[in-house]
């Protein structure tokens, strides 16, 4: 009589053979292989696209809220060049990006986190109260220390840095050592954000 152990081994062997034959069929059949690849690629892209969309929405909302209340802020988005050395200067965290959290960080002027920058990597906050080198450029007198820091960082790497002036409430972006004022209209602002975050800095 067949023992339980022998029966279990036979079942495992059969399962392995079925899996191996299925894999072989997929590899040999171009149409099936293409379907499997498209399916898994589509799932990955769907998740990635959803994360992107949520981040764009949250960043737009954050900048508009900070702008409306004239809360000074600087938010650096890591690109291809690592910002790890600046992450280490500040307080390392791991947190989802949310308007409520960002407003809380920058709102309290008595907080040690108020003046530093927030660094974002892969749609998550990885550091708060980080500091960047100041630019040596002669810039408009209306720009403050946050703008100088944003320019200083982007002169050295491909990060995209968003700044809100606590004096005027204006929203700006710094890219490759150049600073530009952004729109205060929600739809237009989001279009600009998507442009700067998806176009490779030149």
Curated annotation (Swiss-Prot):
Name where it's found: Cell membrane
Q: Does the keyword Cell membrane apply?
A: yes
Where it mainly occurs, coarsely classed, is membrane
Q: Name one GO cellular component term.
A: plasma membrane
Q: What does the sequence similarity comment in the record state about its family? A: Belongs to the adenylate cyclase family. DacB/CdaS subfamily.
Give the protein's function: Catalyzes the condensation of 2 ATP molecules into cyclic di-AMP (c-di-AMP), a second messenger used to regulate differing processes in different bacteria.
State the protein's name: Diadenylate cyclase
Q: Give the taxonomic lineage as stored in the record.
A: Bacteria, Bacillati, Mycoplasmatota, Mycoplasmoidales, Mycoplasmoidaceae
Q: Which gene encodes it?
A: dacB
């Amino acid at each position: 009589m067949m023992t339980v152990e022998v029966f279990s081994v036979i079942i495992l062997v059969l399962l392995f053979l079925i899996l191996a034959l299925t894999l072989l069929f997929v590899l040999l059949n171009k149409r099936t292989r293409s379907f499997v690849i498209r399916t898994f690629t589509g799932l990955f892209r769907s998740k990635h696209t959803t994360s992107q969309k949520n981040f764009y929405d949250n960043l737009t909302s954050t900048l508009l809220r900070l702008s409306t209340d004239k809360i000074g802020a600087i938010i650096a988005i890591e690109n291809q060049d690592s910002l790890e050395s600046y992450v280490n200067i500040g307080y390392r965290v791991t947190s989802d990006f949310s308007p409520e959290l960002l407003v809380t960080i920058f709102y309290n002027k008595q907080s040690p986190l108020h003046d530093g920058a927030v660094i974002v990597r892969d749609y998550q906050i990885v550091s708060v109260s980080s500091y960047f080198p100041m630019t040596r450029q002669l810039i408009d007198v209306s720009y403050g220390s946050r703008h100088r820091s944003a320019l200083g960082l982007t002169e050295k790497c491909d990060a995209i840095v968003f700044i809100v002036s606590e004096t005027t409430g204006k929203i700006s972006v710094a890219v490759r050592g150049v600073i530009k004022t952004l729109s205060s209209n929600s739809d237009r602002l989001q279009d600009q954000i998507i442009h700067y975050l998806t176009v490779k800095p030149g």
